[in-house]
Amino acid sequence: MSGDYQLRCPTCGLRITDRYSSFCPAGHPGLLVTDYPERTLSLSGQPGIFRYESWLPVRGRLPFTGGTVTYQSDGLAEELGLAHLFIGFNGYWPERGADLVTCSFKELEAVPSMLRATERTAGILVVASAGNTARAFCQVSALTGIPVVIVVPQSALPRLWTTEPAPAALVIGVDGDYADAIAYSTALAAVDPRLIVEGGARNVARRDGMGTVMLDGAVTIGRIPDHYVQAVGSGTGGVAAYEAASRLIRDGRFGGRLPILHLAQNLPFVPMVAAWEEHTRDLQVGPGTPYTEEAEQWVSAPVLTNRTPPYGVPGGTYDALEATGGEMYAISNGLARAAGTLFTDCEGIDLDPAAAVATASLIQAIEMGTIEPGSRVLLNITGGGYDRVVEDHTLVPTPAGYRVPAGNPDDEIRRDVITWVNDHA
């Protein structure tokens, strides 16, 4: 528990008390960073993510035992010729002790985010998602009764389910893509002052929750890995890994070198890969570029599409790649499918499509020589175990309360949402 932490602006260094803050009071656009009073990582006796609660921006706990399970690979490591491949598995795989029942590392974001919101505000979070994040927030709401408003593209609605009913989750499906869902959620939050924009990449609880993947990896390996591999849509997971590794360096017990970030996107929607190849902060997305809404429809991992990622902002993905000497990879659907099959054959568990993209990028990095056979590698499997979870749990669909066009909420939606807030605040 970290009741005395502060938030720091990466541009001006100003430190502030957290009031569910997302921006520097001086107006700087960078991502706020959490400064914890505990310089060394203290491991609690709690299971899952709360093992690392000393570096989470929360005071209390929720009834939640899931977290990353890191183990040293035998099968995939031998197949790829790696001596020290460690897999950070985030999903459902009880035989390995993995208990993220929505089969995604997004639960690592949802748990501290909802706890931080209850501790720092009296409001209700409004969360925009491409699918996996929404499912995770609905699951936490189902377990705790904490109300939440979820806004997703209508195409993501089939991916919304929980293992318990979630009556305190209001789901709105937008006729559009993830960017449309983000815009609608922002407009919706303005309807009532008790509604709070969750913040996405600007939410330090999300980043520090994701950062526990790096913490668990370093604790398991005994040091910071040489390489960190993940598929990204917003790039926030890479930023989280970089921030967590920076804290481990200040700790002093896990080595003094940052891991090289290897971040992958799914062809044909790879705007961050293109920008990084040009070594520019400027992201080219939308009409007149290859990275349009139409391109988003062709990827095998829709959660990896984001037209407004925090790529070029101070403290964002560009800076994390720059600081670590990182690499980016553009992975086709075919390569991702083949890599996912290889992983399942070698390790014995099914993968989320995004995790298959990450596995394919690991293979590509080895072939390119950017990852050496003798180095210590942490592969973040951001989701998996969908086939396994249905053996133990009945999945409860989370229906949409409303299906709406993209744009601003109309008067009827505004009235209904205010009524819903009155009933749940």
From Swiss-Prot:
Q: Which residues carry this modification: N6-(pyridoxal phosphate)lysine?
A: 106
Q: Which UniProt keywords apply?
A: Coenzyme M biosynthesis, Pyridoxal phosphate, Transferase
Which E.C. number(s) belong to this protein? 2.5.1.76
Example GO BP: coenzyme M biosynthetic process
User: What cofactors does this protein use?
Assistant: pyridoxal 5'-phosphate
Q: Which InterPro entries match?
A: Cysteate_synthase, TrpB-like_PALP, TrpB-like_PALP_sf
Oligomeric state and interaction partners are given as:
Homotrimer.
Matching HAMAP family, A to Z? Cya_synthase (MF_02109)
Purpose = Specifically catalyzes the beta-elimination of phosphate from L-phosphoserine and the beta-addition of sulfite to the dehydroalanine intermediate to produce L-cysteate.
What is the official name of this protein in its record?
A: Cysteate synthase
**What is the species of this protein?**
Methanosphaerula palustris (strain ATCC BAA-1556 / DSM 19958 / E1-9c)
